[in-house]
């Protein structure tokens, strides 16, 4: 454990310093490169390449070795610079389903000092147009199927081998290249490129917007380099075979599987789209050792364990990494009962913190039930009372603030949101109600904006949700505030029942009332086929709140 100032007196057990009310990471110090002109692609390529295969397409079996990867990254960058005219600061949009070539595009673009941004492939044309109007991309990498969602006349590189004239006629875009052809073309030999600084913007990914509108998060080369440095320091992530189960337009998917895994020498099996059976088939076929999952997928693995283990050989699987929401003791115990040879690790981070926050990195740490782990390398934390602004100490709840080299510079074109979220000292206000215990473990109580205010009491939805999904007839659940004239708000549950279940509203209400204080009782239940979530597995409470009040 290392601290920035030598005269600080820090409790080695909790990591807390009383003199400045700051918690420090107990992990190894983060080793960052001193070169101010080092771009993140060069930093990744400079790491020792221990592995052979970088990426595998799960559906076709097509492989991309590490040597092939860096060869085509250089070729695509050369084409972008000399033929398309991409320069430092230009924005390049990736609108594509998962593919082994997304990392190629991402690394090529950032090596030029240009900026990578992504869009959700499920978004409508109007939603994509709004994002394009804000980010103003010079170029879009997309497929022939998705090209019609783009505005006419925008420059496009196709990531599939469709007839470019047909695509231009049917969608109106201007095709300036085919990715497969760029990857085959020998480099020009002219290496003159713009000088890139670590403080330059490398990426601009849009936050999930679970509590409001989506915002473009600015990521510098320094932010991403800090992420990669932390990733390769996590020795348990080296030389593994991952299955990419999440969309690569999302920050976790892009950072972990287009950057971190490349630097660590691991192999990534990429699913073009998620399906539980597709994931299990990939584990069996490619002998995958680790899965990164959102909590709902973990629950699905528990519920279908007997059938899945009978159908697939999962003996290679050793680890599951889970993020998006803390796991309850009941869920963890159920998983370990069904999959006794697989260890669970948890992680906690935001798009704005680039994979840094807290995590469990050993079996012993994972046994700290309810905790999301110890603070990440290079991260400092404060717990701040949201009402008084007083900085809190060990085991005292408040809003979590984080600071460190991985913290974003802010939101693109949104100074108001930046100032609300990141203060002048660089502290990122996460909006989560948390506490850090005497051993330095971080516990997430709930989203501050999502706390239900019932007659002056604060009710954390996550606590009730953990109880609900422990019910044998409940597949998934979400709890929201429902407006009430007398109480202000009360807890309402949306419940997705398991197939064949006839669970009633009264049974749900009684199930919870027997386990919680009176002010935490659920007083209204609605049944729904599935709980709406973001690509990363976070519950879209704003959609449920809108649904619940639409009939008022």
Swiss-Prot record:
SBD1: annotated span: 275-346
Region of interest called SBD2, as start-end residue ranges on this chain: 347-411
SUPFAM superfamilies in the record: Acetyl-CoA synthetase-like
Residue numbers binding ATP: 207-211, 215, 346-347, 351, 432, 447, 538
InterPro entries: AMP-bd_C, AMP-bd_C_sf, AMP-binding_CS, AMP-dep_synth/lig_dom, ANL_N_sf
Keyword field contains ATP-binding: yes
Induction comment from the UniProt entry of this chain: By wounding or by jasmonic acid (JA) treatment.
Cofactor(s) required, per the database record: Mg(2+)
Catalytic activity: (E)-4-coumarate + ATP + CoA = (E)-4-coumaroyl-CoA + AMP + diphosphate; (E)-4-coumarate + ATP + H(+) = (E)-4-coumaroyl-AMP + diphosphate; (E)-4-coumaroyl-AMP + CoA = (E)-4-coumaroyl-CoA + AMP + H(+)
Example of a GO cellular component annotation carried by this entry: peroxisome
Positions with a binding annotation for (E)-4-coumaroyl-AMP: 252, 324, 346-347, 351, 449, 453
The protein's Enzyme Commission number: 6.2.1.12
Short sequence motif Microbody targeting signal: positions: 550-552
Example GO molecular function: CoA-ligase activity
Enzyme class: ligase
UniProt: CoA binding residues: 273, 455-456
Subcellular location field: Peroxisome
Keyword entries, A-Z: ATP-binding, Ligase, Magnesium, Nucleotide-binding, Peroxisome
Comment block on domains: Both substrate-binding domains (SBD1 and SBD2) are involved in the substrate recognition, and are sufficient to confer the substrate specificity.
Role summary: Carboxylate--CoA ligase that may use 4-coumarate as substrate. Follows a two-step reaction mechanism, wherein the carboxylate substrate first undergoes adenylation by ATP, followed by a thioesterification in the presence of CoA to yield the final CoA thioester.
Protein known as: 4-coumarate--CoA ligase-like 3
């Amino acid at each position: 454990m290392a601290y920035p100032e030598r005269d600080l007196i820090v409790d080695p057990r909790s990591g807390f310093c009383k003199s400045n009310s700051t918690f420090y990471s107990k992990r190894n110090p983060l080793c960052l490169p001193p070169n101010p002109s080092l771009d993140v692609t060069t930093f990744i390529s400079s790491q020792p390449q221990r592995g052979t295969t970088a990426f595998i397409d799960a559906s076709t079996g097509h492989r991309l070795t590490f040597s092939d990867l860096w060869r085509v990254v250089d070729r695509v960058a050369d084409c972008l610079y000399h033929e398309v005219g991409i320069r430092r600061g230009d924005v390049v949009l990736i609108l594509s389903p998962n593919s082994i070539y997304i990392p190629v595009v991402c690394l090529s673009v950032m090596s030029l000092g240009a900026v990578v941004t992504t869009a959700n492939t499920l978004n409508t044309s109007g939603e994509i147009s709004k994002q394009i109007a804000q980010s103003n991309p010079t170029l879009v990498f997309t497929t022939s199927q998705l090209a019609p969602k783009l505005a006419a006349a925008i420059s496009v590189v196709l990531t599939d081998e469709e007839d470019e004239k047909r695509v231009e006629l049917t969608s109106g875009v201007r095709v300036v290249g085919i990715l497969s052809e760029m990857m085959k073309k020998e480099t020009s030999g002219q290496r003159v490129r713009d000088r890139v600084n670590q403080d330059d913007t490398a990426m601009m990914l849009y936050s999930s917007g679970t509590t409001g509108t989506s915002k473009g998060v600015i990521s510098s080369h320094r932010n991403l380099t800090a992420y990669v440095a932390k990733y390769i320091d996590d020795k348990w992530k080296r030389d593994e075979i991952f299955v990419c189960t999440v969309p690569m337009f999302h920050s976790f998917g892009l950072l972990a599987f287009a950057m971190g895994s490349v630097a660590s020498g691991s192999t990534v099996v990429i699913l073009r789209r998620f399906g539980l059976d597709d994931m299990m088939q990939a584990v069996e076929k490619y002998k995958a050792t680790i899965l990164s999952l959102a909590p709902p997928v973990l629950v699905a693995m528990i519920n279908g364990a007997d059938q899945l283990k009978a159908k697939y050989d999962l003996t290679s699987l050793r680890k599951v990494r889970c993020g998006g929401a803390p796991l309850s003791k009941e869920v963890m115990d159920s998983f370990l009962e069904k999959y006794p040879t697989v260890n669970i690790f948890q992680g906690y981070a935001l798009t704005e913190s680039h994979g840094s926050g807290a995590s469990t990195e050993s079996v012993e740490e994972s046994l700290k039930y309810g905790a999301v782990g110890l603070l990440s390398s290079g991260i400092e934390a404060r717990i701040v009372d949201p009402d008084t602004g007083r900085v809190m100490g060990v085991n005292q709840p408040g809003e979590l603030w984080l600071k460190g080299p991985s913290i974003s510079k802010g939101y693109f074109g949104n100074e108001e949101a930046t100032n609300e979220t990141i203060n002048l000292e660089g502290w990122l206000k996460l909006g989560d109600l948390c506490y850090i215990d005497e051993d330095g473990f971080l516990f997430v109580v709930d989203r501050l904006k999502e706390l239900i205010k019932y007659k002056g009491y604060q009710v954390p939805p996550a606590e009730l949700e953990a109880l609900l999904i422990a019910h044998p007839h409940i597949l998934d659940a979400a709890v929201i505030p429902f407006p009430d004239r007398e109480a202000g708000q009360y807890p309402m549950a949306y419940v997705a029942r398991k197939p064949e279940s006839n669970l009633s509203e009264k049974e749900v209400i009684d199930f919870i009332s027997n386990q919680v204080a009176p002010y935490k009782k659920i007083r209204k239940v609605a049944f729904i086929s599935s709980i709406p979530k973001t690509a990363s597995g976070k519950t879209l409470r704003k959609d449920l709140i809108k649904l619940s009040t639409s009939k008022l």
